[in-house]
C-alpha cells in the first residue's frame, strides 16, 4: 500500500446522499464497506467528519446567530455524524473509536493524541468529532490539524466531485480538472478545495491532499493504494 497511515475527511453533505437533510444509512454502509477493505490491508485510518448535513455554522451566523454559538452547534452536529459512522463501521466488523474535541464522556472518548495513535496502531479506526473544539475553524482545518498531529502520510478529501477544477464543474461545462497541482496554486488561485488555513497547514507540514469522488465504489481503497484517481495537491 502506498500509505501506512491516512486521514479521511468526509463532509456532512456526503453522508446525506441524495436527501436534502440528515443521514442516508445506505451511504454510511457503503463507506463502511470501503473502509473495511482499506483496514484489511493494514493501513491505519482516521476520519474527520463534518456536520453540514445537520447544521452549518456559517449559515447560522448569516441568519443572525452569534458566529461562535453557531459554530458550537455545528460541532455538536459532527458528533452525531461521528457516532452514526462508528455504528456503521462496527456493524461492518471494524473496531472503531470516536474521540471528540469537546468532552462528552457518555458517548465518546475525549481527544487525546497519544491514545488516538495507539488505537490506530492496534488496527482501530478513529473518528474525530466536534471539530477542533474552537469556533471559527472549519472541519477541513481540523482534518489538516489532526493529520499533522497523528503523523498521517496523506489527507483524503472525499467529495461529490472527482477532483479539483479551475472552476465549478456543476456551473461551467468547460471546467478543467487538475490531475496534480501545488498548494501554492490552490492558494494563489483561490480554488475551492479547502479553506486557506487547512491548505496552509498541509503545506507547512508537507502532507499531500488527494481529492476524489466518494460515491464511486472502491475509490477510498484506490486512493490509499496510491492509484492515480482524483487530484493530488502537494509541495
UniProtKB/Swiss-Prot annotation:
Biological function: Catalyzes the reversible phosphorylation of UMP to UDP.
Question: Among its keywords, does the record have Kinase?
Answer: yes
Q: Which UniProt keywords apply?
A: Allosteric enzyme, ATP-binding, Cytoplasm, Kinase, Nucleotide-binding, Pyrimidine biosynthesis, Transferase
The protein's name: Uridylate kinase
The keyword Nucleotide-binding is annotated on this UniProt entry: yes
The entry summarizes how activity is regulated as: Allosterically activated by GTP. Inhibited by UTP.
Instruction: Give me the Gene Ontology terms describing cellular component.
Output: cytoplasm
Query: Which EC numbers characterise this protein's activity in its record?
Result: 2.7.4.22
Top enzyme class, one word, equals: transferase
| Pathway(s) annotated for this protein in UniProt | Pyrimidine metabolism; CTP biosynthesis via de novo pathway; UDP from UMP (UMPK route): step 1/1
Annotated family: Belongs to the UMP kinase family.
Annotated stretches, region: Involved in allosteric activation by GTP: 17-22
Residues that hold ATP according to the record: 9-12, 52, 56, 159, 165, 168
| Ranges in coiled-coil conformation | none
Q: Name one GO molecular function term.
A: UMP kinase activity
Residue positions binding UMP = 51, 71, 132-139
Q: So what does this thing catalyse?
A: UMP + ATP = UDP + ADP
Q: How does it assemble?
A: Homohexamer.
Report any one BP term from Gene Ontology.
'de novo' CTP biosynthetic process
Q: Show which residues constitute the signal peptide.
A: none
